[in-house]
């Protein structure tokens, strides 16, 4: 069997490389305080109830199993579209084709009111199922929660934009979220966080009835930390706790992480014995727990979408998921099936000094912007445009590396972003 020369180079570089773990946080907010006025958030939380959730959930369940590409899956997407539209939200189908599947995501948008903010937050779930079952928990629970939260938040205004998205293609390879994340990256969408609710409707222990689990990659742990703070803030009302565990690469948030965004999978704690089967039905859900989990997710979404961002930095170049050859992007890489090893969205740089550029949004003056590789300082820039030609200092960059950028304000606030790259270049600053 002949192998594509590009794939051969990729394999060689991966063999030569070692993994590097870096913790990035693209934004810094003002502190969340228990003394903040919470009356409007409490008002929103109180509007979520079991009857509302049951109504949205039953509407989705009426189509039976919703395997991607089938008529029942398409009918379910129309139901979701009509539900968003009835809320007065801007809504669209996001069509995609991949690996023999043709389907569509449903995207509803609640525009932010801050004219200086391009920030987006995504609250999502997947409406497709396996062939065998109706998917009451996996992931009818997440989709109905998205709809319930959207129905409440649509009556309020927030500084930053919220997108409510239901994906198809999750059970066949997370193809719906992959295509959306890839396209969002190429558009330059300023997505701050992706909150993916996938199986949030079950509890059969006292402890499990009070816990919602967050599975962030290291770079996105700040989301779980923020959610923990919000859970503590509304503890007396909701009796819910956030527990943080290591990430799992098979959910819809991972596609966004692969393309340089922050995201987290959110699920119940107790093991669910009916998953991926004909027994994944509504009568097996714990509706009391499910309602509390949805209320907590509303509070987290509303709090984070309203809070002003003090400083944010984005790595704009090189483009995520491209092959660069002597400083020029020559082709888009295609690793849609490589979700388990982080190859989706990976950027490859061969030869030359490719330009890295960053954009900073800040409510106060920027002191400087620092570019690093694998956690080591290489260059700083005090004036926009913030740019750097990617190269080693004394030695070439060869293999797998992480490019980081840090933006420092005059008051000491810091935001950072990162990009995983595979490089084969002999360029150095000092010969």
Residue ranges and their predicted role:
Residues 1-30, 313-318, 405, 421, ...:
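Secretory targeting signatures
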Residues 205-312:
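Active-site-adjacent substrate-binding region
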Residues 39-47, 61-72, 93-97, 130-139, ...:
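Second-shell loop/turn segments in exported
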Residues 55-111, 239-240:
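A non-catalytic alpha/beta surface segment that caps or lines the substrate-entry region
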Residues 130-222, 226, 248-249, 253:
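Acidic/histidine-rich catalytic neighborhood of metal-dependent amide-processing enzymes
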Residues 313-430:
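Long, low-complexity serine/threonine/glycine- and acidic-rich segments characteristic of extracellular
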Residues 24-71, 110-111:
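N-terminal hydrophobic or amphipathic helices/low-complexity stretches enriched
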Residues 66-68, 97-101, 112-116, 127-131, ...:
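Solvent-exposed loop/turn segments at secondary-structure junctions
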């Amino acid at each position: 069997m002949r192998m594509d020369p590009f794939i051969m180079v990729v394999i060689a570089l991966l063999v030569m490389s070692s993994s590097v773990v870096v913790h990035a946080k693209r934004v810094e907010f003002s502190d969340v305080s228990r003394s903040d006025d919470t009356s409007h958030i409490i008002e929103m939380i109180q509007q979520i109830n079991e009857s509302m959730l049951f109504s949205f959930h039953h509407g989705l369940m009426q189509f039976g199993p919703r395997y991607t590409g089938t008529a029942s899956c398409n009918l379910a997407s129309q139901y979701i579209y009509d539900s968003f539209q009835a809320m007065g939200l801007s809504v669209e189908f996001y069509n995609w084709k991949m690996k023999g599947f043709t389907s569509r995501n449903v995207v509803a948008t609640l525009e932010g009111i801050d004219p200086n903010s391009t920030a987006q937050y995504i609250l999502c779930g997947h409406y497709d199922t396996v062939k065998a079952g109706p998917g009451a928990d996996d992931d009818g629970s997440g989709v109905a929660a998205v709809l319930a939260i959207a129905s409440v938040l649509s009556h309020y205004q927030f500084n930053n934009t919220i997108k409510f998205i239901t994906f198809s293609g999750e059970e066949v390879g997370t193809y719906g979220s992959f295509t959306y994340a890839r396209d969002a990256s190429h558009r330059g969408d300023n997505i701050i966080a992706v909150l993916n609710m996938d199986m949030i409707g079950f509890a059969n222990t006292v402890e499990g009835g009070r816990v919602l689990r967050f599975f962030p990659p290291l770079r996105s742990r700040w989301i779980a930390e923020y959610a923990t703070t919000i859970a503590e803030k509304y503890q007396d009302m909701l009796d819910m706790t956030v527990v943080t565990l290591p990430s799992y690469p098979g959910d819809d948030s991972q596609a966004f992480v692969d393309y340089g965004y922050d995201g987290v999978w959110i699920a119940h704690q107790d093991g669910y014995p009916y998953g991926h089967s004909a027994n994944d039905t509504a009568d097996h859900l714990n509706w009391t727990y499910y309602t509390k989990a949805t209320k907590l997710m509303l509070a987290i979404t509303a709090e984070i979408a309203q809070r002003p961002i003090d400083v944010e930095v984005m790595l704009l170049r090189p483009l995520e998921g491209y092959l660069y050859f002597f400083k020029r992007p020559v082709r888009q890489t295609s690793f849609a099936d490589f979700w388990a090893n982080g190859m989706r969205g990976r950027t490859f740089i061969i030869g030359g000094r490719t330009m890295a550029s960053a954009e900073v949004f800040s409510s106060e003056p920027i002191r400087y912007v620092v570019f690093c590789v694998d956690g080591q300082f290489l260059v700083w820039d005090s004036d926009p445009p913030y740019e750097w030609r990617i190269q080693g200092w004394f030695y070439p960059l060869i293999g797998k590396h992480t490019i980081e950028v840090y933006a420092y304000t005059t008051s000491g606030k810091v935001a950072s972003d990162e990009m995983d790259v595979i490089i084969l270049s002999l360029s150095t600053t000092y010969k």
